[in-house]
């Protein structure tokens, strides 16, 4: 089998080319603007304000580098030391000294960009712990208010029923749990507050109704690959075989805000229903991809749920406030009891794809994570960037089998589920003819960009792999 090359920023007509030429300069400009706004609150701290001016100047210069398509430079020894930059970046640039912003692997350059931005803040002691993307994370979560409240109310309503079902297992109960499992998976998949129609039927009778089945069928129509059933089988088998042993589910996280909230909601469902006994969340160690989850973002989210100025749901006695407080309290209990655990690792913010989650990758924690994730019953990889790293961000034919596209992960003992709303050029595992059909459909509204249907966020995939050599 010939392994195809990766998507490049020079590939004409691709979303990667558009990202490098248009989106990245905008992202850096937004960071400059947000830094300026934050500086207004720091004027009394002269040192911090002046250091902010230095960062702002350097961000402007960096933005111009991207626009001018200058060569990507290695990190200096000082930068590596100050910001704990993994040496993998310089190793790549040593092998590819000719690359510039307009002609480089998209995956490498995008990850490199966020490392460069982080270095600028780490150099200035007053700003070393500052998350330049935090304001945007917060404002986006705040705008999800109605979805957050609705999901909290649904969870509160389901909680006693879940506990009852856990105490009285059986085939009929499993049928209901299976429906709920699919719905919580989909909420986590889409990761936004516009898809909560899934849980509008919250009673067990409604879930079993014809109307409920129709709503689910409609919601699944945009999921072009759907292996949810296989994940369900893995967890129910683990539950049957458990005999008091741990049932572990890992989440390799994507976005903070509502998506993290939805991921926590899925974890709470798994724990309350007995489909899992422990959930481990893997976060990023630096501000990354604008909205990715860092360890601090969990505490911020729980605080936001209780903050009646952030989420103005009325007096503490209102049902909305009670539901938000209940879920915040549930999360704290799960964390304090060890049922939910958060971890971070620099591997997730290197440019290395997940073919390096392997016993042979001994330099950047790939082997350590591989050994650990083998202990998990199911590893859920969230979002588009994780999908790109799973597939190597390569130019696979779109009908390529999932097991082929994820390389060593297909057989190295990690049971995985990728939940991805499609926002990049790479796409695999499609049945014959579907790519042409969707390209034609997207072309009608977006002339010349039919193949971008898989970059639009309008479709999604749920891809499972047992990790077992067949």
UniProtKB/Swiss-Prot annotation:
Q: What is the effect of changing residue 192 to A?
A: Abolishes catalytic activity
Q: What is the effect of changing residue 110 to A?
A: Strongly reduces catalytic activity
Listed name of the protein: Damage-control phosphatase YMR027W
Explain what the record says happens when changing residue 420 to A. Abolishes catalytic activity
Q: Which UniProt keywords apply?
A: Hydrolase, Manganese, Metal-binding, Nickel
User: Motif location (Subfamily III RTxK motif)?
Assistant: 420-423
Q: Name one GO biological process term.
A: DNA damage response
């Amino acid at each position: 089998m010939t392994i195809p090359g990766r998507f490049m920023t020079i590939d004409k007509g691709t979303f990667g080319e558009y990202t490098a030429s248009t989106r990245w300069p905008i992202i850096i400009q937004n960071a400059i603007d947000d830094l300026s706004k934050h500086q207004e609150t720091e004027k009394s701290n002269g040192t911090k304000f002046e250091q902010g001016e230095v960062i702002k100047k350097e961000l402007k210069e960096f933005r111009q580098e991207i626009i001018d398509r200058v060569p990507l430079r290695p990190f200096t020894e000082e930068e590596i030391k100050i910001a704990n930059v993994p040496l993998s970046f310089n190793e790549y640039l040593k092998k590819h000294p000719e690359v510039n912003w307009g002609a480089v692997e998209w995956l490498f350059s995008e990850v490199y960009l966020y490392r460069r931005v982080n270095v600028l803040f780490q150099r200035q002691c007053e700003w070393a712990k500052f998350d330049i993307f935090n304001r945007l994370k917060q404002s986006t979560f705040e705008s999800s208010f109605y979805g957050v409240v609705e999901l909290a109310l649904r969870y509160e309503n389901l909680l006693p029923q879940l506990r009852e079902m856990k105490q009285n297992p059986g085939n009929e109960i499993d049928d209901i749990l299976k429906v709920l499992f699919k719905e919580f998976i989909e909420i986590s998949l889409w990761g936004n507050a516009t898809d909560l129609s899934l849980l509008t039927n919250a009673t067990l009778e409604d879930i079993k109704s014809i109307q409920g089945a129709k709503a689910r069928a409609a919601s699944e129509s945009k999921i072009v690959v759907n292996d949810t059933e296989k994940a369900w089988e893995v967890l129910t088998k683990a539950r049957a075989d458990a005999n008091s042993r741990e049932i572990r589910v890992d989440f390799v996280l994507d976005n903070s805000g509502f998506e993290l909230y939805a991921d926590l909601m899925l974890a709470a469902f798994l724990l309350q229903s007995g489909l899992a006994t422990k959930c481990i969340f893997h976060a990023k160690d630096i501000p990354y991809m604008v909205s990715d989850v860092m360890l601090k973002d969990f505490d911020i989210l729980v605080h936001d749920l209780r903050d009646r100025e952030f989420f103005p749901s009325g007096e503490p006695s209102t049902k909305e406030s009670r539901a938000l407080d209940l879920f915040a309290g549930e999360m704290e209990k799960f964390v304090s009891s060890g049922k939910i655990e958060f971890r971070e690792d620099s591997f997730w913010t290197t440019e290395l794809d997940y073919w390096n989650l392997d016993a042979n990758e001994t330099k950047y924690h790939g082997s350590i994570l591989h050994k650990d994730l083998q202990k998990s019953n199911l590893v859920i990889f969230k979002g588009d960037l994780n999908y790109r790293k799973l597939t190597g961000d390569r130019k696979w034919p779109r009908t390529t089998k999932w097991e082929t596209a994820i390389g060593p992960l297909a057989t190295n003992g990690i049971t995985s589920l990728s939940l991805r709303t499609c926002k990049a050029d790479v796409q695999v595992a499609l049945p014959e003819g579907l790519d042409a059909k969707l390209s034609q459909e997207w072309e009608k509204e977006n002339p010349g960009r039919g193949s971008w249907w898989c970059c639009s966020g309008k479709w999604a995939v749920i891809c499972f792999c047992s990790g077992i050599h067949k």
